[in-house]
Amino acid sequence: MSAGQTYYEFYRGSSIGTALTDALDELITQGDIPPQLAMRVLQQFDKSLTECLQKGVKNKTTIKGHLSTYRLCDDVWTFVVKDPQFKMEGVGAGSEMVTGSKIKIVACKSGDAADGKKAGGARE
């Protein structure tokens, strides 16, 4: 990890993040790894998943729904959308529509924007 660069930890709450955390907890409990190593693994997970999503996701998704709640706290936006409809383009041949009852979207500043640099397409 680059010095001074921090990554958000909210991907640890995903299914793969939870599985990793459970596996690391088991290894610590069995005495196979020290807790410091587990923390380094989780920090690398945060970094790797963030970079993978930034560089690897090229599909476009449009979300429509009813905005139920929104909040800004410490430069983190949280939106709760009821009855969302996701239209995903570039998935197979054409586009795919997925619906749900409620979603929570958490939006954070990118690394460039957090450092005060202008992010691609963002206005200050």
From Swiss-Prot:
Signal peptide: none annotated. One of its GO terms (molecular function) is TBP-class protein binding. Keywords: Nucleus, Transcription, Transcription regulation. One of its GO terms (biological process) is RNA polymerase II preinitiation complex assembly. Coiled coil: none annotated. It is found in: Nucleus. Gene3D superfamilies: Transcription factor IIA (TFIIA), beta-barrel domain, Transcription factor IIA gamma subunit, alpha-helical domain. The keyword Transcription applies. The keyword Repeat does not apply. InterPro entries: TFIIA_a-hlx, TFIIA_b-brl, TFIIA_gsu, TFIIA_gsu_C, TFIIA_gsu_N. One of its GO terms (cellular component) is transcription factor TFIIA complex. It holds the Pfam family TFIIA_gamma_N. It comes from the Eukaryota. TFIIA is a component of the transcription machinery of RNA polymerase II and plays an important role in transcriptional activation. TFIIA in a complex with tbp mediates transcriptional activity. TFIIA is a heterodimer composed of the large TOA1 and the small TOA2 subunits. Belongs to the TFIIA subunit 2 family. This is Transcription initiation factor IIA subunit 2.
